[in-house]
Amino acid sequence: MTIERYNPRAQEQKWQAIWDEKKIFQTSHEDEGEKYYVLEMFPYPSGRIHMGHVRNYTMGDVVARYKRAKGMNVLHPMGWDAFGMPAENAAMQNKVHPKAWTYQNIAAMRKQLQKLGLSIDWSREFATCDVDYYHRQQMIFLDLYQKGLVVRKVAKVNWDPVDQTVLANEQVIDGRGWRSGALVEQRELTQWFFKITEFGEGLLARLDDLTEWPDKVRVMQKNWIGKSQGLYIRWALDKTQLPHNDGCEGFDEITCYSTRPDTLFGASFLALSVDHPVAQALARNDEELRAFIEMCRCGSTTTEALETAEKQGFRTGVLAVHPLNPAVRLPVYIANFVLMDYGTGAIFGCPAHDQRDLDFARKYDLPVQIVVAPKEAEEQDFTLSDTAYTGDGVMINSDFLNGLTPKDAFEVVAQHLEKQVLNGQPQGQKTVQFRLRDWGVSRQRYWGCPIPMIHCAACGVVPVPRADLPVVLPEDVTFDRPGNPLARHETWQTVACPSCGQPAKRETDTMDTFVDSSWYYARFTAPWAQEPTDQDIAAQWLPVQQYIGGIEHAILHLLYARFFMRAMKLAGHVNADEPFTGLFTQGMVVHETYRDAQGWVAPDEVSIVEQDGKRRAYKLTDQSEVTIGSIEKMSKSKKNVVDPDDIISSYGADTARWFMLSDSPPERDVIWSESGIEGAHRFVQRVWRCVALSAPILSTIEPCAGHQGEALELSKAAHRTLCAVEDDLEKLAFNRAVARLYEFLNIMAPLLNTVADLDDEMKSALRQAMDFFCAMIAPMMPHLAEECHAALGGKTLMSECAWPVYDKALIVEDSVTLPVQINGKKRGDVTVPVTADQAEIEQAVLALSFVQAQLAGKSVKKMIIVPKRIVNVVL
């Protein structure tokens, strides 16, 4: 019998059209069934989806389809994170308006995503640049302003003088703007802030409740929030050696914040931020210090960047009096690694027990005094090389602290300094600090959500009345020069003050695009609502049960979303505290890189051959050899990208989906390979061939589990596979589910190819097994599952079928296989009934041929049996 090959292009388009026509993926909050909300992080509309998108959205779709089959009312929406810098860059480079560029890209990417057969409720689609969306975002801004969670204050920012905008710390590379290459300036600008610090304690405490989040993400957020117990320590200043003492008048002390006051006897210097008031005062009369400060301001100010940058300091001539030993004076430095916005902008350095301080001390030849030693170490023998000792131990070289643990020493120092007085005040004070800082949301950009505030010369800053929202971006703007077009648009800026009616100016800053993505999940629950949410409907869906996205969003996006949920609850828009119950961070899609003398070479320009046991790569154009490089994340810059459209056109969406799920655990990177995608395609064709051969007979057979013989064994395999795959999908272990389905088809294939020769009981068991198989592949390869289900006589869409129920009696194992060791070395296995007692197991083991061969007349000294685990024969 000739079987026509499965044509994915034709069949996938057919089933997608049927799904659309029947609107089977549209969700109503009024539908019966337990609600389940699955959401993948929505994409930026760059113009093309990449294989990372394919993997991410396939995973979410598997969850959505599986939960739907389990009878749940599933919400699985899609939208676009559409504001941002790239659209303005495109406007400048290509003379196209950001709005036109963005919506063109959305249309192209929507078409690509729809080709994947995703079970998305497209009726809820929105882009964050839709006026309808940012109108509601402006409502939220005003609500938070009324609640005191929005403030306007002066902040130091990274200013790009060419692009004329504020840059995030991450956008400053070696002191230069990431796009313009200009030397970045540190400026003080008045900015809008969300008071995320108001929720610092709650954001930290609730991390322990997020048990369905990866531990790594929770640790990253914990460190970012950075709660620390410490001590404010006030140091008296000795300015007698200061060349320009008049510049430091009025400063008689410096307050440091430290989490390690136990190490005070190891202190050898104080370091101040370049923005510390003492540093600024000293710089007024010191040109060299001013130059040093300007140099420090040219670098990135992120904690991460400062930790890796070379430690640099400027010795001021000021000395600090040691609070526990007034006879000791420590030099005061201005240093590039001290941040003004953490603690007090001043620290004391204990080189022996902090690596940063040790690096600094080595560079400037400062004393290194060990004050904590491991408990087991001999005090006189314990030394340091180039690594600070940061472990626990006992205090040494620390006067009245000697012999205490660092924890106890902390308390003793705190009590001592709280009683000791300097200038009429306690010299020490216990305190709690957070690394978390308020979220600056002002951006000097056009393509963002306008901040709904008005500046009036008479009334000050006035919120736009809610009735006057939305503040809509003007479209008559030009991008012929850098900077913010809104700041040059006089007619848009000019508005009557809502309070006094006099001419006033609109705020020209727009919101950070992270604001847009901090609440979109809530809008999806009722995108038609006049308010930002329909609170009753939101309460039915939120929090999102399963959120899927990259670990690169572990801190900013996910932390901001958690803050926003709390802020929106305070404003009466939602009832929940947390936005996402479950979080899954998938790995990246990576690919080999190829390079020749001219640069990077794309995979489709290369042929790979095996020569002398080695893989070699040659350009298709001239057969010149290219170097096979490392496996890296797909990127346009290295040309190691694979276009999903090409894969779908060549192999079909189901093949792409199957490969994305099959090759490695979903939390790990998947290595793209042509052989891998071809293997997935062969499996698709094999499935169809088996179904097409057997369907004429099986479509007439009623499914039923076998009761005896081979039919019973087949049904056991079917029900056990169903049980295992169900467990895998619940755990998002997609690759394990795929492996089981490969094995299951291997069991069924010989029977499917000879179905006419089977007895009636086996045919019924095989029909049930195939029904199970179709149901199990449906979340992963939905088009193929529909085609197979229809060929087998299915009267409804596979996408509307319930998940099968396995028979618990058929999944019970009646035998167990145990590894058999002889003198501790494995020699083979033994299979015994689950109910076998020790004597029966011993008898079965002694009957094994490899055991008999090892005995060779010897007697068994003893046999160790660990039930259901292992057997060890000791000779």
From Swiss-Prot:
Enzyme Commission number, as recorded: 6.1.1.4
Source organism superkingdom: Bacteria
Motif 'HIGH' region, chain ranges: 43-53
Molecular functions per Gene Ontology: aminoacyl-tRNA deacylase activity; ATP binding; leucine-tRNA ligase activity
InterPro entries hit by this protein: aa-tRNA-synth_I_CS, aa-tRNA-synth_Ia, Leu-tRNA-ligase, Leu_tRNA-synth_edit, M/V/L/I-tRNA-synth_anticd-bd, Methionyl/Leucyl_tRNA_Synth, Rossmann-like_a/b/a_fold, tRNAsynth_Ia_anticodon-bd
Predominant location category: cytoplasm
Residues reported to bind ATP: K636
Keyword entries, A-Z: Aminoacyl-tRNA synthetase, ATP-binding, Cytoplasm, Ligase, Nucleotide-binding, Protein biosynthesis
Family, as annotated: Belongs to the class-I aminoacyl-tRNA synthetase family.
Protein name (record): Leucine--tRNA ligase
